[in-house]
């Protein structure tokens, strides 16, 4: 027990040099102002930002807006890209639906039935299936991009958040309601395991380092759990900022990042080896910057944020920080050369 407790403590090493990142572009996106996931597609170099009734597509190098996918009255949340099928996927969370769209023209091709609270979406390259997390329904809709049709529904129960594909045909899903990570076999669409993360309040952000078999789970109580993706064991618990809604991993620099919208920071953690993690100096961003994508080839980070509405308290029900209408933007942050 003592050894396990020691392994779960954060490793703080002041001698470790924190990386320098700076904002190099601010791309105005404008209304709608209610936004969610930010996804970078390495094949096209495009950044997809879900906000309101549309998805805005931005060139990840120049910052030019190259297209829009719309219109979705049920509000968009997640995005997945399937290059081989020339299709992208997004959802209408409040309507319990999803849709496919053409990656070149951005025209909607087909509307698909999902379930209540359709939210995060991811593509698993092993099964070649798209997985839609129906957050409020506690289920996952499985789509075959070849036929653009649902092929299965996985009933999980409990509110779900983000998901990532893993090694050997596994899908890992944050179970926000039950403080757990769910492991799913994407060949059979069956649940393999429920792994508890008891000190993680409402798991939200999720990323993976397949090489070290590590999952990185961000929590609303200012913690990040490092979880073994093969056994489900919690390897370490690290401090992060307030309001994390996304985690990304940079395999070249062996760094993981948590975007924290409530205090306007990015927490930075170095992976020294699969058992040793070091909390570094956070990057200052702006309050509301809570979702994030990464270009793993260059290390560039992409964050959606908006200007805060002065003298307006957060929404009592959702906790969202009120923002100024039409002020949504996409921030580009680059590491120092």
Mark where each language-model region is.
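Predominantly soluble domains enriched in secretory-pathway, periplasmic, or organellar proteins
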Residues: 11-337
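Bacterial N-terminal signal peptides
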Residues: 1-11
């Amino acid at each position: 027990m003592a050894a396990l407790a020691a392994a779960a403590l954060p490793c703080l090493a002041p001698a470790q040099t924190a990386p320098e990142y700076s904002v190099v572009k601010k791309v105005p996106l404008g209304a709608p102002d209610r936004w969610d996931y930010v996804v970078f597609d390495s094949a096209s170099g495009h950044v997809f930002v879900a906000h309101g009734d549309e998805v805005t597509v931005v060139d990840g190098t120049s910052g030019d807006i190259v297209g829009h996918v719309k219109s979705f009255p049920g509000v968009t949340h997640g995005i997945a890209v399937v290059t081989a099928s020339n299709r992208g996927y997004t959802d209408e969370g409040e309507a319990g639906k999803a849709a496919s769209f053409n990656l070149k023209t951005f025209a909607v091709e087909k509307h698909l039935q999902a379930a209540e609270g359709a939210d995060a979406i991811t593509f698993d390259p092993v099964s070649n299936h798209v997985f839609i997390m129906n957050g409020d329904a506690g289920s996952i809709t499985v789509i075959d991009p070849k036929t653009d049709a649902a092929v299965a529904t996985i009933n999980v129960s409990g509110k779900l958040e983000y998901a990532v594909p893993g090694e050997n045909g596994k899908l890992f899903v944050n179970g926000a309601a039950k403080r757990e990570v769910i492991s799913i076999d994407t060949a059979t669409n069956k649940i393999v395991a429920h792994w508890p993360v008891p000190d993680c309040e409402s798991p939200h952000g999720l990323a993976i380092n397949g090489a070290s078999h590590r999952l990185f789970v961000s929590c609303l109580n200012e913690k990040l759990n490092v979880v073994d993706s093969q056994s489900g064991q919690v390897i370490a618990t690290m401090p992060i900022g307030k309001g994390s809604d996304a985690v990304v991993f940079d395999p070249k620099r062996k760094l993981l990042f948590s975007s924290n919208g409530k205090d306007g920071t990015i927490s930075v953690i170095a992976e020294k080896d699969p058992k040793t993690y070091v909390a570094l100096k956070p990057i200052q961003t702006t309050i509301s910057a809570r979702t994030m994508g990464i270009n793993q080839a260059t290390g560039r980070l992409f964050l959606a944020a908006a200007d805060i509405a002065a003298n307006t308290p957060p929404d009592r029900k959702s906790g969202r920080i009120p923002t100024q209408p039409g002020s949504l933007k996409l921030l580009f942050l680059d590491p120092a050369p």
